[in-house]
Amino acid sequence: MSTIKLSQKVRVSDPCYDNDVWCKTNLSNVYPGEYNVEVDKTDLGDWGNRISRLTVIHKGYVVECADESSWTPHSDIGVDSGQAGIFCESSYRNDELAAGITTPPLDRPFVIPFRNEGDVWYDKMCNFTLAGESWGAYDTGVVTSSGIGDGSYPLDVVYNDTDEIVGIRITYLDDTEDEDEGDCCGVCGGEIEDDGECAYCCD
């Protein structure tokens, strides 16, 4: 299992965003320490295996965070580059730190103009999410591709007894919604009946 180290201040954001963008979240009451990284994937058929959830949990609060009722809605995370992550504030868009980040090799490397401060770091994050696993971590941050693309995704947290955050979770795909919707026809998208036939296509 991968781990990252977080300080009291944490940025949860699409890595393409600078400080002027509103649809990011700055957390200032995170319990400092080492966090376990959990990346869940969901098989979406023709869409392939997509990342459905990114979770980081303080190593001292694994049991507490295992209780689903302990998670509290916090905010929504905007995504415009098909990826998002959880980063120690000191490392976010830090080009100097990026020099020490190793990313998987790509057959067709992602190339950006490097016009703005933070672009060297951003390039490394893109290389993580474009690689086969669609995510990656460095000492003080983790980034993943965002389910099936851009949008707004819920951020949930867990607090300890002193109101410090000890668990952080971004949900890209909600499995419970898929279960409620039932099977869909591959031709028209209509719901499949109990007899296995589509009421629209089979009339």
Task: Identify what each model region corresponds to.
Residues 1-180:
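Intrinsically disordered, low-complexity acidic regions enriched in Pro/Ser/Thr
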Residues 186-188:
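Extracellular/surface recognition and adhesion modules
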Residues 192:
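Cys/His-rich microdomains that often coordinate metals
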Residues 195-203:
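Cysteine-rich micro-motifs
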